[in-house]
Amino acid sequence: MTEYCAENYTLQLGYHIVALITILAGGTGSVKLIRGLASQTRELTVISNIGDNIWLHGLYVCPDIDTVIYGLADILDKSQGWGIRNDSFGFIRQMEMLGEQTWFRLGDRDLATHLLRTNMLKNGKNLSEITDWMRNKYAISTKIIPATDNPVETKIITDVGELHIQEFWVKFRGEPKVTDIVYAGAERSRVNPDAIHALKRSKVIIIAPANPVTSIGPILAIKGIRKELILERKKIIAVSPLIGERAISGPAVKYMRALKIQNSPLGVAEYYSDFVGTFIISRTDRNLAAKISRFNIKVYETDITMDDSKDESRLASYLLKQSKSF
């Protein structure tokens, strides 16, 4: 067992870690690493993407927040990366019979989450309070913080018009040509003060291997977050969401091209270069290490795939090991 002690925290690799760790995360591409970190540390905070939140059937749905909650509660449908395992779909079938649009499949058990959230919003609770209530209901020790309590929606500008990210990816199957991406409401939003507090007090800040444009991008668009990350640059580790030109999860490549971000780990590193001090890439991308280091970023190579719980814990341990120098 490797042990590292500094100031008021301890890293004990291969065992439970007592540390102040914050991760910026989306959903499907992030929850694996979040699970791995949660298996290693007793003090983990997730700053969650809110850009894919959407109103459907009169209910407020927060796909990334819910994926993190379900993943940590061990009820996530891992085969599809979202929703609740073995859920039923009677509600959706009934809505379809009644002629309603059912392109976004809400499971019956999943529906309870959205119904309760919506009722609590109507009764004056904010998204942070509701999310904290839910994670406590599932006995989750990891803190989950929405980047803001204000409405922010990622909009995909396409050749068929402006689409909410869920419409683009689910309803239209990601087929329209993408010309731009905007974070509607971000300029008017107020950063969650708990998110800033978590960034300031953490010894390690991790950027999950999530879509840099539509999962991490909306978080960065919230006023104050990117500024704080720049101040904390030395303690920030990002994991590449790409291996070569292939996204580990989801349609990152299409979004990156729309914003003219190079389709490679090098492109992601450049996109993050003002606030990331350490970048983790796949061993198969070692030829990019020297170019990435020109951004004054430390580069490490390892296996960044996560196919099972052992992989999740392995990568989490590796990241924490690299943080020894912070």
What feature does the model see in each segment?
Residues 49-183:
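Electropositive, gly/pro-rich neighborhoods at or near active sites that engage anionic ligands
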Residues 42, 232-236, 297:
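A short helix->loop->beta-strand "cap" motif at the edges of active sites that frequently abuts
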Residues 218-226:
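Charged helix-capping and loop-helix junction motifs
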Residues 249-326:
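C-terminal functional extensions of proteins
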Residues 18-22:
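Extreme N-terminal starter segment of soluble prokaryotic enzymes
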Residues 179-199:
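Active-site glycine-rich loop that binds ribose-phosphate moieties when present
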Residues 233-249, 304-307:
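Short, flexible loop segments at boundaries between secondary-structure elements
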